[in-house]
Swiss-Prot record:
This is 3-isopropylmalate dehydrogenase. The gene is LEU2. One of its GO terms (cellular component) is cytosol. Its cofactor is Mg(2+); Mn(2+). It comes from Phanerodontia chrysosporium. Its main location: cytoplasm. It is found in: Cytoplasm. GO terms for biological process: L-leucine biosynthetic process. Signal peptide: none annotated.
Length: 380
């Protein structure tokens, strides 16, 4: 029987993106080679700043079409000072357009410690950081980033700029229901809904609809509400109070997910996934029953270290593990990838072990990738 093909579009992006994605790609190739019934087909495309340089736009029609027909997408990182915020064409426009086109409405981002040995790298005191285990679910395609806006004009009478933050009942219901995408222990993780209901009308709608949806559809879940300014203080003063699932809208989630992600000490360690509600286009190769998703590390393009081969690829490799974990035929390889990362990390706990510069070591990006692949090959 011939192997079923699973198409993954690779978007290395800018800065350190190509370096860390290369190591995750090696991991996916090992998984594909070890499978008797599924073959991974990798297809690389320009995205972000590198696409601007080559094609004059951050997301070409060809790249978008490839993403629409893919089973999953693995993204590195985009952006850099080369393409400044005042440029009319910016790398970040590619990400917003991709989210909208694919219906990627929810981003899931964890913030936790794989080992207590990493507590020393947290900006928080060990007594405050120990035991933090937060998952941020951020709404991705609504709110201020996608509302109507007006830029500052050149004429005197156009001396103002504005953005609008709009949310509908169905949008809030959809993101609240995405809570089911997070595997839960027994008892289930509590949900902390974050808003600014004391000031914003959209937040008052958010709080009302989130409460009704949880009460009517997930009565077993514990739900509480925090104002965004209070939540931002808790994340640095007593983050364990927010252990569980943080559920919030686009702008607040952008800020709070970045704030919580620095608690583990290195942005290079953590993966993330962006989810679509359902397949929006037929795949001519085979029918799919699961929605399209984008997987990426939480870090940025880090142009200051790009090309030096010292970026930490663990977050990208774990993003590949998340990708595999969504497919029943690859749940075992997903766990094997996570175990291989843990094996490489344990070596890093030793004085002369494997650690990249962000964790106080001198290992190269390829050193980490090689060790993970070595352990993975011995396991699969």
């Amino acid at each position: 029987m011939s192997k079923r093909t699973f198409k993954i579009v690779i978007l290395p992006g800018d800065g350190i993106g190509p370096e860390v994605v290369a190591e995750a790609t090696r991991v996916l190739e090992v998984v594909s080679a070890s499978s008797s019934d599924v073959e991974i087909k990798l297809e690389t495309h320009d995205f972000g700043g590198c696409s601007i340089d080559k094609h004059g736009e951050p997301l070409t029609a060809a790249t978008l079409e490839a993403c629409k027909l893919a089973d999953a997408i693995l993204l590195g990182a985009i952006g850099g000072p080369k393409w400044g915020v005042n440029s009319k064409v910016r790398p970040e426009q590619a990400l917003l357009a991709l989210r909208k086109a694919l219906g990627l409405y929810a981003n899931i981002r964890p913030a936790n410690f794989a080992s207590d040995s990493l507590l020393a790298y947290s900006p928080l005191k060990p007594s405050v950081a120990r035991g933090v285990d937060i998952i941020v679910i951020r709404e991705l395609i609504g709110g201020a980033y996608f509302g109507e806006r007006k830029e500052l004009g050149a004429r005197a009478q156009e001396d103002a700029a504005w953005d609008t933050m709009i949310y509908s009942v169905p949008e809030v219901q959809r993101i609240t229901r995405s809570r089911r995408q997070v595997a839960s222990p027994d008892p289930p993780l509590p949900v902390h809904s974050i808003d600014k209901a004391n000031v914003l009308a959209s937040s008052r709608l958010w709080r009302k609809v989130a409460t009704e949806t949880i009460q009517n559809e997930f009565p077993q879940l514990k739900l509480d509400h925090h104002l965004v300014d209070s939540a931002s203080m808790l994340i640095v003063a007593n983050p364990k109070k927010l252990n569980g699932v943080i559920l919030t809208e686009n702008l607040f989630g952008d800020i709070l997910s970045d704030e919580s992600s620095v608690i583990p000490g290195s942005l290079g360690l953590l993966p993330s996934a962006s989810l679509a509600a359902r397949p929006l286009w037929p795949n001519t190769a085979h029918r799919r029953s699961s929605p399209r998703r984008v997987y990426e590390p939480i870090h940025g393009s880090a142009p200051d270290i790009a090309g030096q081969g010292i970026a930490n690829p663990i977050g990208t490799i774990l993003s590949a593990a998340m990708l595999c974990g969504t497919r029943s035929v690859w749940r075992s390889p997903a766990k094997a990838i996570e175990a291989a990362v843990e094996g490489a990390r344990r070596q890093g706990d030793r004085r002369e072990g494997l650690r990249t510069a962000d964790l106080g070591g001198s290992s190269k990006t390829k050193d980490i990738g090689h060790k993970v692949v070595e352990i993975l090959k011995a396991t699969l």
